[in-house]
Amino acid sequence: MNLPNKLTLLRIILVPFFIIAMLVNFPFHYLVAGCIFGVASVTDTFDGKIARSRNLVTDFGKFADPLADKILVLTALVCFLQVGLLGSFGAIPVIIVLFREFAVSGIRLVAASSGKVVAANIWGKIKTVSQMVGISVIFAMQVVLEVLNAMKVSTGFVSEVFYYIGNGLIWLSTVFTLISGIIYLKDNISFLKDN
């Protein structure tokens, strides 16, 4: 197994540790979870660059890399929902992202069974980057709140502002998620009809 594929697998292996850090309430648990998410996100940047620059692109990598992204992002969103960071309507973006990811994965599986590999397109990459940025900003804001709370500083107003910023970024990434899903479907509709 080559280095880019190992980095992709590392991203998946980090997910259970991320879940524990998110859901087990201990001092600065958002900092720990955010660091794990950050390391996993960095592997996403490097696996593709290394694969392309060293001519190590494989069918496994084309399939597993976006799958690892889906697992990481969906896990983060579900954890945010569980701990109340996405608010009353937070389930809506999570459901939209989940539906899109299942639909695109279905397209990929149908294509793979016919010997065709559906690689990520630019809209899929924009979607992933916007999700990673939104999630990372939420972590950064939660770490600020953890520090302020540790210093016994009132966080009421700051917490509310952070809540709206974080939710706005998640909803923006959800728009990109919808666009990329529609484009995937449009680009592969003729192939799906034939199968």
PLM regions and their residue ranges:
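Structural signature of transmembrane alpha-helix termini at the membrane-water interface
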Residues: F17-V24, F46-K49, V78-G84, A103-G106, ...
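Membrane-embedded alpha-helical segments that form the functional core of polytopic membrane enzymes
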Residues: L14-F63, A76-L98, V161-F176
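Juxtamembrane helix-capping/reentrant segments at transmembrane boundaries
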Residues: M1-P4, D47, A51-D69, G115-K127
